[in-house]
Amino acid sequence: LHKDIEKSELRFALGIPGSMTLRTLGITDTEHANSRWNEHLLKYKSRIRLFDGIPQLLGNLKMNGYQLGIVTSKTRNEYTTDFAVPFALSDYFCTVICVEDTLRPKPFPEPLLSYLNASHINAENAIYIGDTIYDSQCAQKAGVDFGFAAWGNAATQGVQADYLFKRPADIPFSLIKS
């Protein structure tokens, strides 16, 4: 692109596949650009941290019988190298749906519907917790309640949520109450 892009102009990219972001930015060789992106990510990988309370939250939910899964816009390779391996959280999740597992990514409902099908869960017995408008739209289109994880995201415009979680510790309390 050879141009500076303001951080605020890139908010749209949070929660959609990298290839979709690159095409939106006018980049045609998305394979090369994605490769470069992943190379740069490796340089800063050690700075990436989980939000406080996430391991405790996942342990608490699993211990209380909740079936946990992930629906992500990351590729399976990105999920493995950026999340599963560095944070050692894979044991908490029964099913992981990555971008290449369905034909249409979030905000379409297919990834979440695929998760529900693979996990043998009805939409009315599920809650999808996410932090982007694309997560909200995906849940709404799939007929699943949506919990907005607002602790790390200032971009709430347009997000429709059944639950608002201001910090990870709010999640179990909210689920038990309902």
Regions from the PLM with identified roles:
Residues 1-59, 64:
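N-terminal helical cap/lid subdomain that shapes the substrate entry/recognition surface
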Residues 13, 71-73, 129:
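Structural motif
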